[in-house]
UniProtKB/Swiss-Prot annotation:
Changing residue 67 to S: In a glioblastoma multiforme sample; somatic mutation. It comes from Homo sapiens. Residues 176-196 are annotated as: Disordered. Involved in the chaperone-assisted selective autophagy (CASA), a crucial process for protein quality control, particularly in mechanical strained cells and tissues such as muscle. Displays temperature-dependent chaperone activity. It is found in: Cytoplasm; Nucleus. This is Heat shock protein beta-8. It comes from the Eukaryota.
Length: 196
């Protein structure tokens, strides 16, 4: 075999080209193994905050092999990229919140609007003469609103660091008329008095 036919120049004819991630019979389990142990033993977890421990000690959602990206509801939490292009749903009672870095734009150059279930953030610099040329910057970012958020309640604020913070409270769950989740009668020790 000539050196020109091998992907790497190696002068040992007994060496064969191999990919350890594809050729080995164990390659399918190479990155899947938990080795029968939790990621963190119990004695090391005493100092971890309560919110971090379940996230760090939970099992990996699926296999991750070269060239593969996990898809599913946990992909958002683990990789910061929402599955199916949606923003993550807020936790019950917490407002929906998204931050957009707009540090190179002035407040008067930014526009935030809601349309068809999306928040659209856009910014545009006027043309400026810089370093022997004309520079113009503009961007548009669309963020899909979760179903739990009313588009009318969306508001935005700009931090001193140049982060545009877009927030909206969750819509409270509606109950249908006649549902037994609430009582129509006033309690006997009520402070209300009927006026005559």
């Amino acid at each position: 075999m000539a050196d020109g036919q091998m992907p790497f120049s190696c002068h040992y004819p007994s060496r064969l080209r191999r990919d350890p991630f594809r050729d080995s019979p164990l390659s399918s389990r190479l990155l899947d193994d938990g080795f029968g142990m939790d990621p963190f033993p119990d004695d090391l977890t005493a100092s971890w905050p309560d919110w971090a421990l379940p996230r760090l000690s939970s099992a990996w959602p699926g296999t991750l092999r070269s060239g593969m990206v996990p898809r599913g509801p946990t992909a958002t939490a683990r990789f910061g990229v929402p599955a199916e292009g949606r923003t993550p749903p807020p936790f019950p009672g917490e407002p929906w919140k998204v931050c957009v870095n707009v540090h190179s734009f002035k407040p008067e150059e930014l526009m935030v609007k809601t349309k068809d279930g999306y928040v659209e953030v856009s910014g545009k610099h006027e043309e400026k003469q810089q370093e022997g040329g004309i520079v113009s910057k503009n961007f548009t970012k669309k963020i899909q609103l979760p179903a739990e958020v009313d588009p009318v309640t969306v508001f935005a604020s700009l931090s001193p660091e140049g982060l545009l913070i877009i927030e909206a409270p969750q819509v409270p769950p509606y109950s249908t008329f006649g549902e037994s989740s609430f009582n129509n009668e006033l309690p006997q020790d009520s402070q209300e008095v009927t006026c005559t």
